[in-house]
């Protein structure tokens, strides 16, 4: 595994700036979803445009949420329920009397209805990759899950499943089952089922042929093929995060019913806290007062929305500051690329320029063919109005007028605002823009843009970008490439493959190799831009060896750009692009490549990137996320590099990991993460991500995302086993081997940093929290293992570890520093990201510590352990997840009966009863016979 401390480097001026396209699913829950007077208002459900039209789907959705509202109300002790819900119908369905959406689109939905591709599967799940108590991204249901009533036997009623997933999404709790560890060893060598609560009953049965001829009774080792089947009738009322399908389960596990022993993700991520404790700590429930006993919540209300014409207006700054650093030229290059390549067909586009006031350059024009695209690009502004400032509100109001000229309102429209200044008057038009129903994407050019510019994006659900003045940066093109239609249909959207720039010396070359992988190749375009003079010498070679030269490109000398569209479908494989600076001085040369899907069934690989917050204050870090997937399947073993660029100074390159450590919550889920804290100046920072994977790598995970409803294999009904259909195998057929590999580039938007000190400062960055501590009992030893944290968060190498134990869970949870310290002084921490192992034995404790441990209140047969890392300045990381281990193993039979054991016990009991009855009859018969013979003897005596 790579050592993380070697992966943080500062780019030189000649370093390549590699960027990646942010996909829709990683937008956080919007401000539209709010809790008002105990009711969740503004929940958005969106149907993917590729879902086949079926009018039965809508009542299934409304029925599910109506049932969920009542179940949620009771599960939260009369605190919350669902109020108004919006259902967004795709434009691929027939038009009915639906309402027109405002800001709502598929990308912003809390609940998405979409098919998987390849193997048909219907597991409901929540995309959740942040910490305990933090919101997830979205809930995913398939159409078949909603339409096929047979699946309720497997997952439970849809309303109950919805509440299970809602707890993931809204409150950041985790599952209480564990498919990888369905059983665990408790004290006294007892085998227990990973469940919550532990009061749920059932039996062990054989799942596979390997144990059909023998009893599935488990002692020291688990037998392969054993599984646990629950009784369908239970007395236990918890827990919804374990098996909501059981009719008796109506609440979350609380502090009295929670199973802290179970090796599940809830215990690992939330430090053994119950789901109800985490939920009660949420903002929602802290401010919610239970309704009176006599009060009942009203049923949810629903509105149906359908997107109509897509309308976009470019609002472009031409004030005096746009003359600096070639800002207007670079903006023109990026806007033209957007119009010619990115914006989807049938979209209406208008263009406005502004300085002290707005100017209409073109009213909305629908794109029907390439001629419309060229006509629109010809109206882009080319000159700056010198000596005049930028009145952003004037430009925005003019943009609204252009949009409203088409249909009378701005509902569902998009404004792309690009500016290098601003006079601070944004507050004067903020409410107007919010109420307009238009989504505003903002692009800040250079270091002197109004500080509150991003409020326009945040409050209207738009994206925000920052483009530096570095001549080798492609930030503007990357920002425009990221802005999609919001429909979620990746088949209709361009995919950015590469974007890079470098300052090239005289007669030197700039080389790029771009891979066009399977599934792409339609509408492929290579864009070359330069800084000064004429175009460089261009040589582009396709995988078959065919070459394209400068004269094959469509060149605009004034715009300093050259395009080449590849006819039909571009060849799959490696394309090489060589740019030769033939001019008399160094200049910045840049290249961008994008393509569209060539396959209408298999989706292309996509990448999404963002940070966990819009703004941070030094020394608090941000977390960078990149979601790499094909359809909904995670891509593994990719090389993911984030490029973070400040307003002033050199960019920083940082490798992201999917290893389940540090900032990364779950291993192998396709979410690559890392802490970033190398702040050099105050202001805006841009995020760009580059993803690359070599050819012939097994890269597509066959697993579904975590945080999904459990697939119930069957139940015990009236003493009989009733099995559900076995879960469909995903097998290796879902794991794709790419002949050529792939590469992607995307923009992750921007974030702001405040309170960065000038000059040298003290080390304020502690090691990150260890989140994957594990304990395994092996004879008299307890083997601890975890992923190493770093000197600073998840980077570098920690100085030491502090391991403590206690028999009392409360003590190690609330008073870690006073728990018993284990001697780990001989252990030298490894670089961040490495696998650590430590063997604990009683010999490591002093006599006094052993006496202290023996005297602690708690169970005699188990101890709790936790760890934290320290750096060279003794800064302490947070305490890890808490694990437990058995102290001794007397060997007692399992606490849960096995199916065959129960059958054998019943047979033996019956045989015993029969034998006892036979013995009683025999004894009675013998006694009666003896008495009868005695009477006959007496009679004979008397006769004599």
Annotate each language-model stretch with its function.
Residues 798-860:
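Recognizes extended acidic, P/S/T-rich segments that occur
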Residues 870-897:
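Extracellular fibronectin type III
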Residues 27, 258-314, 320-327:
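Acidic, polar low-complexity linker/tail segments
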Residues 155-251:
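The catalytic-center signature of Zn2+-dependent metalloproteases
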Residues 308-489:
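Exposed acidic/Ser/Thr-rich ligand/metal-binding surfaces
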Residues 141-163:
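Short pre-active-site segment immediately N-terminal to the catalytic Zn-binding motif
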Residues 27-135, 331-337:
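Zn2+-dependent metallopeptidase catalytic core
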Residues 780-796:
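Conserved aromatic anchor
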